[in-house]
């Protein structure tokens, strides 16, 4: 009788805010008409905790300028502990680089919206992000860079 192949397991075991901040450099922004320019930056990082667990941290940073004056800088490090058991090695990068950030983003989006509103600014709803596409582009760029260095 052939040995049974272990079933791959993928699960989010814990989600938490690792760090968050809101900086409002000057109160003068509250006296001007609100027409902000937003600069949004996203990044993710994965760290292996043990054989089957990874911590993935999605960092979302939003800088708002109003009338050429810095209005606020909001940043959240949304983290999750993911179980990846018996996952084929060639799929782990895609899971950590695209799937996990897709899971974390709605939570990070909510935290950003909440801290911006608590800072007395209008609600900020970030548009959905296609992390699968971003991961594919970063893989293509890494391949181009590797070929250029060869």
From Swiss-Prot:
It comes from the Bacteria. Pfam families: SecB. One of its GO terms (molecular function) is unfolded protein binding. One of its GO terms (cellular component) is cytoplasm. The keyword Iron-sulfur does not apply. GO terms for biological process: protein folding; protein tetramerization; protein transport. It is found in: Cytoplasm. Belongs to the SecB family. One of the proteins required for the normal export of preproteins out of the cell cytoplasm. It is a molecular chaperone that binds to a subset of precursor proteins, maintaining them in a translocation-competent state. It also specifically binds to its receptor SecA. Homotetramer, a dimer of dimers. One homotetramer interacts with 1 SecA dimer. This is Protein-export protein SecB. It comes from Psychrobacter cryohalolentis (strain ATCC BAA-1226 / DSM 17306 / VKM B-2378 / K5).
């Amino acid at each position: 009788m052939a040995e049974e192949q272990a079933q791959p397991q993928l699960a989010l075991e814990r989600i938490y805010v690792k760090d968050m901040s809101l900086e409002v450099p000057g109160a003068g922004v509250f006296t001007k008409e609100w027409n902000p320019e937003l600069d949004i930056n996203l990044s993710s990082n994965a760290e292996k905790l043990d054989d089957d667990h990874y911590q993935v941290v999605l960092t979302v940073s939003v800088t708002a300028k109003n009338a050429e004056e810095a209005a606020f800088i909001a940043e959240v490090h949304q983290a999750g502990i993911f179980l990846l058991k018996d996952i084929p090695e060639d799929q782990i990068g895609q899971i950590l680089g695209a799937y996990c950030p897709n899971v974390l983003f709605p939570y990070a989006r909510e935290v950003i919206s909440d801290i911006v509103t608590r800072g007395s600014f209008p609600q900020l709803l970030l548009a959905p992000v296609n992390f699968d596409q971003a991961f594919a582009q970063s893989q293509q760029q890494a391949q181009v860079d590797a070929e250029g260095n060869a």
